[in-house]
């Protein structure tokens, strides 16, 4: 009998074990679709980004014009750019929903998978930040200036570090050149980390909505979840294409249609919407170093979630108190996102401070306390 190539070929069998014959829980919901959607986002961003890089010029005198030239003179350049810019938004929507799913269903107890995932989030944020600088509009320039300047808050080495990152005494041509190099490199780092993320995931297998072992009831990934994933791809790509075709600038800042000018500061410097929650936390502390530490902590706190898990149950499915806290946290992050887009004045300052405090309180104090209380109430 001939050997099955799919199961015996050195390379094909890796793909087979990851995407075809992979044993998957029979009851995973649509919340488990976001991993594959993130994969599609990554592929879309790399393909569109590569096509854009072919026409882009990383020079302060030419960057803005080269982007305009792309949109006017390159075949479908406008579409490629709009897909790339809005693809980043979809990437972040998917990753935030993916992390939310992980928090709700206790997926963070796969510690290695979770930790690599948090590193992936940091890599994605770095990629998006350096990418936003490349069109060299007003918000690109001032966003780069403000955010890189935060490193100067690091005691003793801060100022030196910032000037080293800038390649001079301000954000200028060397900064743009290196940001382009980093923006080209980082997605491939993300691809590598994604493979590590999947390798760790396939050691344990997927979690499921009940948070219980599902070894006794597995189904093959193909055809069941391949079909389910393709439905997800179709829905997400149709939303992305609709946004890119009907309202491509909806999520952008109008300030970025003005070429970068170091002599004119925009009235409200703010990052893209997906960083606003962290930006609000940064702004809510009236001290530079304190703000930077809070900004870092807002993401790095995710590393602590496996250590703060006090419940005897893995998932929140049967934990109503934790559910209430979880959705309060979601609402809180949305409030932070809104506050981050508002000017620094009353009442936004105090709202931002309260929301920042709530953010850390819920994650670090209330989640573990609620879980311990639920153990008692459920006599576990």
From Swiss-Prot:
One GO cellular component term, please give it. Answer: mitochondrial inner membrane
Q: How does it sit in the membrane?
A: Multi-pass membrane protein
Query: Where does this protein hold heme b b566?
Result: 98, 197
Cite the binding residues for heme b b562: 84, 183
Superkingdom to which the source organism belongs: Eukaryota
Keywords from UniProt, A to Z, are:
Electron transport, Heme, Iron, Membrane, Metal-binding, Mitochondrion, Mitochondrion inner membrane, Respiratory chain, Transmembrane, Transmembrane helix, Transport, Ubiquinone
Which ranges does the record mark as transmembrane? 34-54, 78-99, 114-134, 179-199, 227-247, 289-309, 321-341, 348-368
A single MF term (Gene Ontology): metal ion binding
The subcellular location is: Mitochondrion inner membrane
One Pfam family name is Cytochrom_B_C
Q: Which cofactor does it need?
A: heme b
Q: What is its main location?
A: mitochondrion
**What is one GO biological process annotated to this record?**
mitochondrial electron transport, ubiquinol to cytochrome c
Q: Reply yes or no: does the keyword Electron transport apply.
A: yes
The residues the record assigns to binding a ubiquinone are 202
Cofactor: how bound: Binds 2 heme b groups non-covalently.
* Chain's role: Component of the ubiquinol-cytochrome c reductase complex (complex III or cytochrome b-c1 complex) that is part of the mitochondrial respiratory chain. The b-c1 complex mediates electron transfer from ubiquinol to cytochrome c. Contributes to the generation of a proton gradient across the mitochondrial membrane that is then used for ATP synthesis.
Extra remark: Heme 1 (or BL or b562) is low-potential and absorbs at about 562 nm, and heme 2 (or BH or b566) is high-potential and absorbs at about 566 nm.
Q: In which family does this protein belong, per the annotation?
A: Belongs to the cytochrome b family.
Q: How does it assemble?
A: The cytochrome bc1 complex contains 11 subunits: 3 respiratory subunits (MT-CYB, CYC1 and UQCRFS1), 2 core proteins (UQCRC1 and UQCRC2) and 6 low-molecular weight proteins (UQCRH/QCR6, UQCRB/QCR7, UQCRQ/QCR8, UQCR10/QCR9, UQCR11/QCR10 and a cleavage product of UQCRFS1). This cytochrome bc1 complex then forms a dimer.
Kindly provide the name given to this protein in its UniProt entry: Cytochrome b
Q: Which organism is the protein's source? A: Setophaga americana
The gene name on file is MT-CYB
């Amino acid at each position: 009998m001939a050997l099955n190539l799919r199961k015996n070929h050195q390379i094909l069998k890796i793909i087979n074990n990851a995407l075809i014959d992979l044993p998957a829980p029979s009851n995973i919901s649509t919340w488990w679709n976001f991993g594959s959607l993130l994969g599609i986002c990554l592929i879309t961003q790399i393909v569109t980004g590569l096509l854009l890089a072919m026409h882009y010029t990383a020079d302060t005198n030419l960057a803005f014009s080269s982007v305009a030239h792309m949109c006017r003179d390159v075949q479908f350049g406008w579409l490629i750019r709009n897909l790339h810019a809005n693809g980043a938004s979809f990437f972040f929507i998917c990753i935030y929903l993916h992390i939310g799913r992980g928090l709700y269903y206790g997926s963070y107890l796969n510690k290695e998978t979770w930790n690599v995932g948090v590193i992936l989030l940091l890599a994605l944020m770095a990629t998006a930040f350096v990418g936003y600088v490349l069109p060299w509009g007003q918000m690109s320039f001032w966003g780069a200036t403000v955010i890189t300047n935060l490193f100067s808050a690091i005691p003793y080495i801060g100022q030196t570090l910032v000037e080293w990152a800038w390649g001079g005494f301000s954000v200028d041509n060397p900064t743009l050149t290196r940001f382009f190099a980093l923006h080209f490199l980082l997605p491939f780092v993300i691809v590598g980390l994604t493979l590590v993320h999947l390798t760790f995931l396939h050691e344990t297998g997927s979690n499921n909505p009940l948070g219980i072992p599902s070894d006794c009831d597995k189904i093959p990934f193909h055809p069941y979840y391949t079909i389910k994933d393709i439905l997800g791809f179709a829905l997400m790509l149709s939303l992305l294409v609709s946004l890119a075709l009907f309202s491509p600038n909806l999520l952008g800042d109008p300030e970025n249609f003005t070429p970068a000018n170091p002599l004119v500061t925009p009235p409200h410097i703010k990052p893209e919407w997906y960083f606003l929650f962290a930006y609000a936390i940064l702004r809510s502390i009236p001290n530079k170093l304190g703000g930077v530490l809070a900004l870092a902590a807002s993401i790095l706190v995710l590393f602590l979630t496996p250590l703060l898990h006090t419940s005897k149950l893995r998932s929140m499915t049967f934990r109503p108190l934790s559910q209430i806290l979880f959705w309060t946290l979601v609402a809180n992050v949305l409030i932070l996102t809104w506050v981050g887009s508002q000017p620094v004045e009353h009442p936004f300052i105090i709202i931002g401070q309260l929301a920042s405090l709530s953010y850390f309180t819920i994650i670090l104090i209330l989640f573990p306390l609620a879980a311990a209380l639920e153990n008692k109430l459920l006599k576990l």
